Amino acid sequence: MRLTLDTNVLVSAFIARHGHSANLHELALTAESIELILSEKILRELEDLLTRDEVRVRFSYTHQDVRKRVNALRKSTIIVPVRSRFKVVKEDPKDDIVLNTAYDGRAHYIVSGDKHLLKVRRFKGIRVVNPKQMMDIISKGFSDLVLRS
């Protein structure tokens, strides 16, 4: 199963370390049956968000901590070059990078907490779900997996 995690899910996993986002992040990095599909743009956005002063101070991170964790994530995921330029999310066009990353990486699922992306529900055969829904799918043994051709 190939998953693309939205930046908000990754931020939640980094900060909370508990809950659906953190559990999903851990599974995506350790389960052999799950491949995590990201792009450099998503990783840069993650690093930018986590190194904002208000985030670092509130959660006691240093720039070095963030870089180390993002680099570890980079090494344990499939980084795809994003060539697609689909424009789908009219309310927030910045969200299109997640759809394009998932499409170019042939992901089966996009996992997001973003209301604009969740409204899409399905994109080019890729289901858009929230972290709880994804954990439910995984716990059911991937029975909801729909492969794209």
Name each model feature, range by range.
Residues 1-38:
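Short, well-structured N-terminal submotif of metal-dependent ribonuclease cores
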Residues 6-7, 38-39, 113-114, 130:
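A secondary-structure boundary/capping signal
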Residues 10, 43, 55, 117, ...:
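A generic structural signal for short hydrophobic patches within well-formed alpha-helices
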Residues 13-14, 49, 58, 120, ...:
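Residues that scaffold the ATP/ADP-binding catalytic core of kinase and kinase-like folds
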Residues 28-85:
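PIN-domain endoribonuclease scaffold, especially VapC-family toxins
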Residues 75-109:
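Active-site neighborhoods of divalent-metal-dependent phosphate/nucleic-acid chemistry enzymes
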Residues 105-109, 115-149:
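Acidic, PIN/NYN-like endoribonuclease modules and their adjacent C-terminal/linker elements
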